[in-house]
């Protein structure tokens, strides 16, 4: 592509967290390339910046091995169409944002056709399926990692990797304001709140809404004055959660809010949440938390056989320590969840707070700017 033509960047982001990262990267790249074009699969935040989506990013929001298999024909068709479109477009660079099972195969095909490729957000090769690093080495010109310990892993295998920090650590203030968050959301200024976050995907709510609302009922028995608040990403997830409430806790009152998950966490005294990126946000707003997760039994058996780490949540992985309680699969029961939340409500939070603050500072690196700088260097290098 001639240097006189506007740069073209192709991206694929598969869920909300990827949409946030993609939007930050687009903003940073637009400072260097104001006329750049951005195409691929992105979410609403990316599209608000002019990103042109070829498919809806909901296409990629699939959890679990069994669940992916049921959608595999459609996912393969989406990927094949994308490859055809991007080979015609010949972007200056393709950036796959997370969604490794979809993006790494796509990156390999594009790299073999002469397109520079970047994978933004390292897959958890240090935790499970470590042999993926050899495919990553073939598929990408560079990995952009969010977590500091990941670069050392890639360096060991001589795979180009740049640690950029995490955009969430940049966006979230070191001290979050509980009173301000409650005012924004219209919550009681004095009440004790438990935030309940059962995930953003339909599959997550299918597995977690029931144990979470049953646990909330048990917590209400022990703490009669406690209040509950739950953010849900859209009307579909709200309908799902309300159905679970009707079936499993019809008398329980939970304040439901569309979006604003970060503000809900900041407003809370304690957080019960699904394992995932939200655990990092909970750590960054510095609230005590309990992490719980379960998937289909078949998915769990397959995944467990490939795991290299016994920890799941990002705070525990970052700390290399059991900082927050994790209740996974068989332990994800209403009784165990309620007991773990009670422990957090009753105990001194100071030691956990201090660990959270230390980790927050370590991730605060102006990640979008660093990621953009690495992409720009790759694009401008014509060797």
UniProtKB/Swiss-Prot annotation:
One matching Pfam family: LpxB
Function, in words: Condensation of UDP-2,3-diacylglucosamine and 2,3-diacylglucosamine-1-phosphate to form lipid A disaccharide, a precursor of lipid A, a phosphorylated glycolipid that anchors the lipopolysaccharide to the outer membrane of the cell.
Similarity section: Belongs to the LpxB family.
Protein name: Lipid-A-disaccharide synthase
Keywords, ordered alphabetically: Glycosyltransferase, Lipid A biosynthesis, Lipid biosynthesis, Lipid metabolism, Transferase
Gene name linked to the record: lpxB
Statement: the UniProt record of this protein carries the keyword Lipid biosynthesis: yes
PANTHER family per UniProt: LIPID-A-DISACCHARIDE SYNTHASE, LIPID-A-DISACCHARIDE SYNTHASE, MITOCHONDRIAL-RELATED
């Amino acid at each position: 592509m001639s240097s006189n033509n506007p740069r073209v960047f192709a991206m694929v982001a598969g869920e909300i967290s990827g949409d946030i990262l993609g939007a930050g990267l687009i903003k940073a790249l637009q400072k260097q390339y104001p006329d750049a074009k951005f195409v691929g699969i992105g979410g609403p935040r990316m599209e608000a910046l002019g990103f042109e989506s070829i498919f809806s990013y909901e296409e990629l929001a699939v959890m679990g091995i069994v669940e992916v298999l049921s959608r595999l024909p459609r996912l393969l068709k989406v990927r094949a169409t994308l490859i055809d479109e991007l080979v015609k477009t010949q972007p200056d660079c393709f950036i796959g944002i997370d969604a490794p099972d979809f993006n790494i195969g796509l990156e390999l095909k594009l790299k073999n056709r002469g397109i520079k490729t970047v994978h933004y957000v390292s897959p958890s090769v240090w935790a499970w399926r470590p042999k993926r690093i050899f495919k990553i080495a073939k598929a990408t010109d560079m990995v952009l990692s969010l977590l500091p310990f990941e670069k050392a892993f890639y360096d060991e295998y001589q795979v180009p990797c740049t640690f950029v920090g995490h955009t969430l650590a940049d966006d979230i203030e070191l001290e979050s304001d509980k009173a301000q968050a409650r005012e924004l959301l219209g919550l009681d200024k004095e009440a004790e709140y438990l935030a309940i976050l059962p995930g953003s995907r339909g599959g997550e709510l299918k597995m977690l809404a029931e144990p979470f609302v049953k646990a909330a009922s048990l917590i209400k028995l022990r703490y009669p004055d406690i209040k509950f608040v739950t953010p849900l990403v859209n009307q579909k997830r709200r309908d799902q959660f309300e159905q679970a409430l009707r079936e499993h806790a019809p008398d329980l009152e939970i304040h439901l809010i569309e979006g604003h998950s970060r503000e809900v966490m900041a407003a809370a005294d304690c957080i019960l949440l699904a394992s995932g990126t939200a655990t990092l946000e909970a750590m960054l707003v510095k609230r005590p938390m309990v992490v719980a997760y379960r998937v289909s039994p078949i998915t769990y058996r397959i995944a467990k056989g490939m795991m290299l780490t016994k920890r799941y949540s990002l705070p525990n992985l970052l700390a290399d320590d059991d900082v927050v309680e994790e209740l996974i699969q068989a332990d994800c029961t209403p009784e165990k969840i309620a007991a773990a939340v009670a422990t957090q409500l009753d105990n001194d939070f100071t030691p956990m707070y201090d660990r959270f603050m230390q980790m927050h500072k370590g991730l605060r690196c102006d990640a979008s700017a660093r990621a953009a700088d690495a992409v720009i260097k790759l694009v401008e290098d014509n060797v």
